[in-house]
Amino acid sequence: MLRTKDLIWTLFFLGTAVSLQVDIVPSQGEISVGESKFFLCQVAGDAKDKDISWFSPNGEKLSPNQQRISVVWNDDDSSTLTIYNANIDDAGIYKCVVTAEDGTQSEATVNVKIFQKLMFKNAPTPQEFKEGEDAVIVCDVVSSLPPTIIWKHKGRDVILKKDVRFIVLSNNYLQIRGIKKTDEGTYRCEGRILARGEINFKDIQVIVNVPPTVQARQSIVNATANLGQSVTLVCDADGFPEPTMSWTKDGEPIENEEEDDEKHIFSDDSSELTIRNVDKNDEAEYVCIAENKAGEQDASIHLKVFAKPKITYVENQTAMELEEQVTLTCEASGDPIPSITWRTSTRNISSEEKTLDGHMVVRSHARVSSLTLKSIQYTDAGEYICTASNTIGQDSQSMYLEFQYAPKLQGPVAVYTWEGNQVNITCEVFAYPSATISWFRDGQLLPSSNYSNIKIYNTPSASYLEVTPDSENDFGNYNCTAVNRIGQESLEFILVQADTPSSPSIDRVEPYSSTAQVQFDEPEATGGVPILKYKAEWKSLGEESWHFKWYDAKEANMEGIVTIMGLKPETRYSVRLAALNGKGLGEISAATEFKTQPVREPSAPKLEGQMGEDGNSIKVNLIKQDDGGSPIRHYLVKYRALASEWKPEIRLPSGSDHVMLKSLDWNAEYEVYVVAENQQGKSKAAHFVFRTSAQPTAIPANGSPTAGLSTGAIVGILIVIFVLLLVVMDITCYFLNKCGLLMCIAVNLCGKAGPGAKGKDMEEGKAAFSKDESKEPIVEVRTEEERTPNHDGGKHTEPNETTPLTEPELPADTTATVEDMLPSVTTVTTNSDTITETFATAQNSPTSETTTLTSSIAPPATTVPDSNSVPAGQATPSKGVTASSSSPASAPKVAPLVDLSDTPTSAPSASNLSSTVLANQGAVLSPSTPASAGETSKAPPASKASPAPTPTPAGAASPLAAVAAPATDAPQAKQEAPSTKGPDPEPTQPGTVKNPPEAATAPASPKSKAATTNPSQGEDLKMDEGNFKTPDIDLAKDVFAALGSPRPATGASGQASELAPSPADSAVPPAPAKTEKGPVETKSEPPESEAKPAPTEVKTVPNDATQTKENESKA
């Protein structure tokens, strides 16, 4: 058992040592076509000098170092077989043979399998197709085993779409029948080999090209030549890819690359072709061609170029008398072919015209027309106009037919006139060449010495023989003879003695109440000269004289009626007619009797309409007819559009001659009825029908400027007008009442004083006024409101409605009246010594706005009364006023100041000015020249101050209203103003009022210093463009200094005494007397008494004062 085992191992080792073992790694080989792979042949054994060889499947030994199938001997025990880029033919069993040194061989084999991997041999992308064709998408798949092909689109199997248009062909191509643009996209060709689980795919982009479509916007385009026009031809093309455009003209390409081609201009995409300066040569058929990959298409546009007609040929012609015919020719060009017409200066000749005798024949063919005149007459000569017309326009040319003929004479053969009446015998001459004209009488050439009353006037077309018959011998035959080189012609004229016309015949008379219409026939014989007028005579039965009236013959002959007016109703009349010509009044007709109708209703007026220029208004004229013997009271007019309601009736005065109907409906028919009415009743209605114009589409040139404004524009205009009215009102309030927005701005921004400040000054009895920022006088107004009971125990009489507002002016030359009449104006009137100034009163004054300032300036005088003064006892009190004596206890009432700030002050005259106190005026103010303001004046010292005045009650009349205070015992003082110097010294009366004897014997007082022109004692404040003085200013001093008047004396208390009233109205005009002075209230005067100039008081005459007390008068 043991020996057997050992024997086996011994045999094994012996066998191994003798034979070699060959192995190939890898033992199996699969290669895809195109891939490379190597195999290693290894030998195991101790044999030396072995030979390793490789054999191909066909048994051929593979030589080493080949390029595609390479064999490399690595060492004694191994060798490598490498197959590069294997193909199907390389498949098979490869054998590795090892040969030992003793010749024994050992081998090993490897089965090399080569398979075709899934490959897309023919599957291009993109693949393009034409829309509508059957598209086949190519996809060739190469594989060792037959693959399964699946087509997908948008991730889905196209077969599963159940679209019969999609078919997979036997060669695995995909067919799409009638491919659409919507089928465009990416298609996936996917191949699968189930045995190997191999899969591969290829995405193919499918593009569907759409053949171009092109359409001309206009197949026919019209243009007009030679007008500098441009025309654009447009083609709209569509397709995919976007087609390119090209153009041809009558088959010839129009190049788009010529930069210097100013005739043709292309758009960026060449879809538009613009032809500039179109002329006739541009007329052609233009083709636009659209082309892309899918094909091409074209469209045609026919450019039709029209041309205005143009006359290309005309020729003047000359013809002789007795020639048979002449032809005028006219040629014209144009497109469309123009039609040619003929006309002369007086008539149109139709293209088909042919007179009965064949005198004119018109023939036309294409562009040529001819006018043939047969049996030519001299009247055929002249201008012939050839006109060529088509739808584009027209052209005309003139040609002239010159006809040479003997003279032809025309004119009225019988000419009527009378002795002493100048008349012209007219001999009209038609001749070519021009003829020489001569006049003969009884074979004698005119003019001649035997016929001094004959004159001849020649014109190119006629000769006039002016004859003024002196006797019967001048009447008879006159011969006119014309001669030219063709021949001559003569014509006899007869100058006939004219006669008066025969009588017209009255057919019938149509009487009415106050008129009658006489219908007549014209005279049978006019006497050879025209009838100028008709004379109608009529009278009532029993009257001896005839009434008559002349009627123009032209108007009367139109209707054969004359109307007699102004007749009496129900009265019998006789009427007769006569005609008047240049010779004289003709026979009068037989009288015809008629009787007027009784008083009745009037006849309907005659209506005539005249449409307005706007088209929807009418002026209906009313022509008065018979009034029925009673004056017409009025006319009643009513109108309406047909089938509409009547408009409200219109009543017109009897004197109306028309009625205007406006704002009528457009294009509507209206009817108008007019009835005349007198005391007897209404007439029949006169009826008038008219139609308005159609509403215009455009605004007429003479239409209303706002007719075409929109609602917004009208509202805007109204707003602007409203704002302007507010501005005007504000400015008015500023200047009149010192209020409003403008005043607020002036107060807050410009520092002006407001109306409240001015009112405060008014309450204090002060006022300031200024103009152009200059200092002006401040006027203090004094009024006397109450009369003291000791003035003769009388009371002031209340004026009634019969009391005059102003007293009669005294005839003295020294009266100056100043009245304020709005608007603010300063008027200085110098009449002898009279000065009148007008100021604007304060806006806040409760009185009216009229102030009368009367000043009296007394000349230097002694204490002796003026010899011309009238004693107080002679003065007669004015009506309604009780004379009373002044009392020292009574004091004038200080009224609020008059604001004259808005009134420009004009300087009075430099001449001597003097004034006297008006009758029944309590005080006077004496204005003077500004130059005298700086002068000083002296006056006697004043007496003691009077008691303080009593304040005015709230319910009293306006404090500016002057109270008439006449006095019968106070003489007036006369005062004279110097011309160039300041006021001279003058006498003054004591402060207390004295009776007339005392006033006459009062001694003169020492003189005092007058006020200067700058009396301001306080700070100047700007107000209303002037200087406002502080309340501590001596107002009276300022006023009199500015006016150049002496200042009145004041008492110790600074209050002026009462002034002596002026004399009342008297039968004898009073002479100027000395004026008694009263103290003037001031705040800055010292207590001691000073001599002051004569006082001046202001009388305000209000326009409308409120009467509250018995002692207050109406202004």
UniProtKB/Swiss-Prot annotation:
Glycans are attached at residues 222, 316, 348, 424, 450, 479. The chain crosses the membrane at residues 712-729. Residues 20-711 are extracellular. The modification Phosphoserine is found at residues 770, 774, 887, 890, 926, 946, 958, 1005. The modification Phosphothreonine is found at residues 929, 1001, 1030. Heparin binds at residues 152-156, 161-165. The keyword Phosphoprotein applies. Disulfide bonds join 41-96, 139-189, 235-288, 330-386, 427-480. GO terms for molecular function: heparin binding. Residues 500-599, 601-696 form the Fibronectin type-III domain. Residues 20-111, 116-205, 212-302, 309-402, 407-492 form the Ig-like C2-type domain. GO terms for cellular component: axon; cell-cell junction; external side of plasma membrane; growth cone; myelin sheath; neuronal cell body; plasma membrane. Residues 730-1115 are cytoplasmic. Residues 756-809, 839-912, 924-1115 are annotated as: Disordered. Keywords: Cell adhesion, Cell membrane, Disulfide bond, Glycoprotein, GPI-anchor, Heparin-binding, Immunoglobulin domain, Lipoprotein, Membrane, Phosphoprotein, Repeat, Signal, Transmembrane, Transmembrane helix. GO terms for biological process: calcium-mediated signaling; cell surface receptor signaling pathway; commissural neuron axon guidance; epithelial to mesenchymal transition; homotypic cell-cell adhesion; neuron projection development; positive regulation of calcium-mediated signaling; regulation of exocyst assembly. It holds the Pfam family fn3. Residues 902-912, 926-935 have a biased composition (Polar residues). SUPFAM superfamilies: Fibronectin type III, Immunoglobulin. Polysialylated by ST8SIA2 and ST8SIA4. Polysialylation modulates cell interactions by confering both attractive and repulsive properties that are highly regulated by ST8SIA2 and ST8SIA4. Polysialylation is formed on a-2,3-linked sialic acid of core glycans. Interacts with MDK. Found in a complex with SLC39A6, SLC39A10 and with NCAM1; this complex controls NCAM1 phosphorylation and integration into focal adhesion complexes during epithelial-tomesenchymal transition. Interacts with synaptic plasticity regulator PANTS. This protein is a cell adhesion molecule involved in neuron-neuron adhesion, neurite fasciculation, outgrowth of neurites, etc. This is Neural cell adhesion molecule 1. It comes from Mus musculus. The gene is Ncam1.
